A protein has these predicted regions:
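Membrane-interface helix termini and inter-helical loops of multi-pass transporters
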Residues: 3-6, 51-63, 107-125, 167-177
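Helix-helix packing/entry segments at the starts of transmembrane helices
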Residues: 13-19, 81-101, 132-168
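Hydrophobic/small/kink-forming positions within alpha-helical transmembrane segments
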Residues: 21-26, 73-76, 107, 128-133, ...
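Transmembrane alpha-helical segments that form core, pore/gating elements
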Residues: 24-26, 53, 57-113, 206
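Hydrophobic transmembrane alpha-helices of multi-pass small-molecule transport proteins
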Residues: 35-55, 106, 165, 177-196
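C-terminal-most transmembrane helix of multi-pass membrane proteins
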Residues: 122, 156-206
Protein backbone atom coordinates (compact mmCIF):
# COMPACT_ATOMS: atom_id res chain seq x y z
CA UNK A 1 0.00 0.00 0.00
CA UNK A 2 2.69 2.51 1.01
CA UNK A 3 4.68 1.78 -2.15
CA UNK A 4 1.56 2.49 -4.19
CA UNK A 5 1.09 5.78 -2.33
CA UNK A 6 4.76 6.66 -2.90
CA UNK A 7 4.47 6.14 -6.67
CA UNK A 8 1.10 7.90 -7.05
CA UNK A 9 -0.83 9.83 -4.40
CA UNK A 10 -2.41 9.05 -1.04
CA UNK A 11 -5.90 9.14 -2.56
CA UNK A 12 -4.99 6.75 -5.39
CA UNK A 13 -3.13 4.37 -3.08
CA UNK A 14 -5.95 4.24 -0.53
CA UNK A 15 -8.57 3.86 -3.26
CA UNK A 16 -6.76 0.90 -4.82
CA UNK A 17 -6.16 -0.84 -1.49
CA UNK A 18 -9.78 -0.40 -0.46
CA UNK A 19 -10.93 -2.25 -3.54
CA UNK A 20 -10.23 -5.36 -1.45
CA UNK A 21 -13.94 -5.98 -0.62
CA UNK A 22 -14.43 -6.72 -4.32
CA UNK A 23 -11.62 -9.30 -4.18
CA UNK A 24 -13.13 -10.78 -1.00
CA UNK A 25 -16.38 -11.17 -2.91
CA UNK A 26 -14.63 -12.87 -5.84
CA UNK A 27 -12.64 -15.23 -3.59
CA UNK A 28 -15.71 -16.16 -1.56
CA UNK A 29 -17.65 -16.93 -4.75
CA UNK A 30 -14.80 -19.18 -5.94
CA UNK A 31 -14.94 -20.91 -2.55
CA UNK A 32 -18.59 -21.72 -3.21
CA UNK A 33 -20.03 -19.32 -0.63
CA UNK A 34 -23.66 -18.33 -1.06
CA UNK A 35 -23.63 -14.53 -1.26
CA UNK A 36 -26.88 -12.63 -1.64
CA UNK A 37 -27.36 -10.24 -4.54
CA UNK A 38 -28.00 -7.38 -2.11
CA UNK A 39 -24.55 -7.93 -0.58
CA UNK A 40 -22.95 -7.73 -4.02
CA UNK A 41 -24.81 -4.49 -4.71
CA UNK A 42 -23.70 -2.99 -1.40
CA UNK A 43 -20.04 -3.70 -2.17
CA UNK A 44 -20.06 -2.18 -5.66
CA UNK A 45 -22.19 0.84 -4.74
CA UNK A 46 -19.90 1.46 -1.76
CA UNK A 47 -16.83 1.36 -3.99
CA UNK A 48 -18.51 3.77 -6.40
CA UNK A 49 -18.97 6.18 -3.49
CA UNK A 50 -15.30 5.74 -2.63
CA UNK A 51 -14.41 6.43 -6.26
CA UNK A 52 -16.30 9.73 -6.13
CA UNK A 53 -14.63 10.73 -2.89
CA UNK A 54 -11.03 9.98 -3.94
CA UNK A 55 -9.24 11.59 -6.86
CA UNK A 56 -8.14 8.87 -9.28
CA UNK A 57 -7.25 11.39 -12.00
CA UNK A 58 -3.79 11.80 -10.46
CA UNK A 59 -2.58 8.29 -11.40
CA UNK A 60 0.97 8.70 -12.68
CA UNK A 61 2.50 5.24 -12.25
CA UNK A 62 1.19 1.96 -13.63
CA UNK A 63 3.55 0.13 -11.27
CA UNK A 64 1.95 1.98 -8.35
CA UNK A 65 -1.44 0.69 -9.51
CA UNK A 66 -0.06 -2.86 -9.57
CA UNK A 67 1.31 -2.46 -6.04
CA UNK A 68 -2.08 -1.19 -4.86
CA UNK A 69 -3.98 -4.09 -6.42
CA UNK A 70 -1.51 -6.65 -5.05
CA UNK A 71 -1.99 -5.09 -1.62
CA UNK A 72 -5.77 -5.29 -2.00
CA UNK A 73 -5.66 -8.97 -3.00
CA UNK A 74 -3.30 -9.87 -0.15
CA UNK A 75 -5.52 -7.98 2.31
CA UNK A 76 -8.57 -9.88 1.05
CA UNK A 77 -6.79 -13.21 1.56
CA UNK A 78 -5.61 -12.12 5.02
CA UNK A 79 -9.13 -11.20 6.12
CA UNK A 80 -10.72 -14.40 4.84
CA UNK A 81 -8.03 -16.59 6.40
CA UNK A 82 -7.73 -14.53 9.57
CA UNK A 83 -11.45 -14.44 10.34
CA UNK A 84 -11.51 -18.11 11.31
CA UNK A 85 -8.27 -17.74 13.28
CA UNK A 86 -9.72 -14.77 15.15
CA UNK A 87 -12.66 -16.90 16.25
CA UNK A 88 -10.33 -19.72 17.25
CA UNK A 89 -7.54 -17.80 19.01
CA UNK A 90 -8.99 -14.35 19.74
CA UNK A 91 -8.50 -10.98 18.08
CA UNK A 92 -5.68 -9.84 20.37
CA UNK A 93 -3.55 -12.92 19.61
CA UNK A 94 -4.11 -12.62 15.87
CA UNK A 95 -3.20 -8.91 15.94
CA UNK A 96 -0.01 -9.65 17.91
CA UNK A 97 1.14 -12.38 15.52
CA UNK A 98 0.40 -10.17 12.51
CA UNK A 99 2.37 -7.20 13.85
CA UNK A 100 5.23 -9.39 15.15
CA UNK A 101 5.95 -11.06 11.83
CA UNK A 102 5.37 -7.83 9.90
CA UNK A 103 8.02 -6.15 12.05
CA UNK A 104 10.50 -8.96 11.37
CA UNK A 105 9.90 -8.94 7.61
CA UNK A 106 10.01 -5.15 7.27
CA UNK A 107 12.97 -4.54 9.58
CA UNK A 108 15.67 -4.97 6.86
CA UNK A 109 13.90 -2.36 4.69
CA UNK A 110 13.38 0.18 7.48
CA UNK A 111 16.76 0.01 9.20
CA UNK A 112 17.81 3.40 7.83
CA UNK A 113 14.71 5.02 9.29
CA UNK A 114 15.34 3.72 12.81
CA UNK A 115 17.00 6.98 13.85
CA UNK A 116 13.87 8.88 12.79
CA UNK A 117 11.78 6.68 15.08
CA UNK A 118 14.06 7.47 18.02
CA UNK A 119 14.06 11.19 17.24
CA UNK A 120 10.26 11.17 17.01
CA UNK A 121 9.58 8.67 19.76
CA UNK A 122 6.24 10.14 20.91
CA UNK A 123 4.92 10.21 17.34
CA UNK A 124 6.04 6.60 16.87
CA UNK A 125 4.31 5.60 20.11
CA UNK A 126 1.11 7.37 19.06
CA UNK A 127 1.05 5.71 15.63
CA UNK A 128 1.92 2.32 17.06
CA UNK A 129 -0.66 2.45 19.84
CA UNK A 130 -3.67 3.89 18.01
CA UNK A 131 -3.19 2.92 14.36
CA UNK A 132 -1.68 -0.51 14.93
CA UNK A 133 -2.49 -1.61 18.48
CA UNK A 134 -6.04 -0.35 19.01
CA UNK A 135 -6.95 -0.51 15.32
CA UNK A 136 -5.87 -4.08 14.64
CA UNK A 137 -7.11 -5.47 17.96
CA UNK A 138 -10.55 -3.93 17.47
CA UNK A 139 -10.65 -5.08 13.86
CA UNK A 140 -9.83 -8.71 14.60
CA UNK A 141 -12.25 -8.72 17.53
CA UNK A 142 -15.14 -7.43 15.41
CA UNK A 143 -14.45 -9.86 12.58
CA UNK A 144 -15.33 -12.71 14.96
CA UNK A 145 -18.96 -11.62 14.69
CA UNK A 146 -19.21 -10.17 11.17
CA UNK A 147 -18.52 -12.11 7.92
CA UNK A 148 -15.48 -11.02 5.84
CA UNK A 149 -17.68 -9.77 2.98
CA UNK A 150 -19.63 -7.53 5.35
CA UNK A 151 -16.57 -6.18 7.13
CA UNK A 152 -15.16 -5.15 3.77
CA UNK A 153 -18.17 -2.98 3.02
CA UNK A 154 -18.17 -1.33 6.45
CA UNK A 155 -14.44 -0.50 6.22
CA UNK A 156 -15.16 1.74 3.23
CA UNK A 157 -15.83 4.25 6.03
CA UNK A 158 -12.13 4.30 6.97
CA UNK A 159 -10.75 6.25 3.97
CA UNK A 160 -13.90 8.38 3.94
CA UNK A 161 -13.32 9.38 7.55
CA UNK A 162 -9.69 10.15 6.76
CA UNK A 163 -10.60 12.47 3.89
CA UNK A 164 -13.25 14.31 5.92
CA UNK A 165 -11.05 14.75 8.99
CA UNK A 166 -8.15 15.78 6.77
CA UNK A 167 -10.34 18.43 5.14
CA UNK A 168 -11.38 19.73 8.56
CA UNK A 169 -7.85 19.87 9.97
CA UNK A 170 -6.06 21.08 6.84
CA UNK A 171 -8.93 23.31 5.63
CA UNK A 172 -8.99 21.53 2.28
CA UNK A 173 -11.98 22.23 0.06
CA UNK A 174 -14.04 19.27 -1.14
CA UNK A 175 -15.90 19.06 -4.43
CA UNK A 176 -19.64 18.39 -4.61
CA UNK A 177 -18.92 14.92 -6.03
CA UNK A 178 -16.81 14.15 -2.96
CA UNK A 179 -19.69 15.03 -0.64
CA UNK A 180 -21.94 12.78 -2.74
CA UNK A 181 -19.38 9.98 -2.42
CA UNK A 182 -19.22 10.52 1.34
CA UNK A 183 -23.02 10.29 1.61
CA UNK A 184 -23.12 7.10 -0.49
CA UNK A 185 -20.46 5.34 1.58
CA UNK A 186 -22.11 6.41 4.84
CA UNK A 187 -25.51 5.12 3.71
CA UNK A 188 -23.97 1.86 2.46
CA UNK A 189 -22.27 1.37 5.83
CA UNK A 190 -25.59 1.86 7.64
CA UNK A 191 -27.37 -0.45 5.17
CA UNK A 192 -24.70 -3.12 5.74
CA UNK A 193 -25.22 -3.02 9.51
CA UNK A 194 -29.01 -3.32 9.07
CA UNK A 195 -28.53 -6.16 6.57
CA UNK A 196 -26.24 -8.07 8.96
CA UNK A 197 -28.58 -7.49 11.90
CA UNK A 198 -31.52 -8.96 10.00
CA UNK A 199 -29.44 -11.97 8.95
CA UNK A 200 -28.37 -12.60 12.55
CA UNK A 201 -31.99 -12.39 13.74
CA UNK A 202 -33.11 -14.84 11.05
CA UNK A 203 -30.26 -17.21 11.90
CA UNK A 204 -31.13 -17.17 15.62
CA UNK A 205 -34.79 -17.86 14.84
CA UNK A 206 -33.86 -20.84 12.68
Amino acid sequence: MFKSIELNTVAVGIGLVFSYPIFILIIELFRGKNIKLLQVALIFIGFFGLYLLLDFSTISSALGVVYGLVSAISLAILIIYGSSKSVQFGGLNVAFVQVFFAAIILSPFTYEGFSWMLDNFLVSMFLGFFLTGVGLTTYWYVIKFIPPVSIGTITYLEPVTGVIIGAMILNESLRVSQYVGFAIVLLIGIAQVIFDTKNQVQSSEN
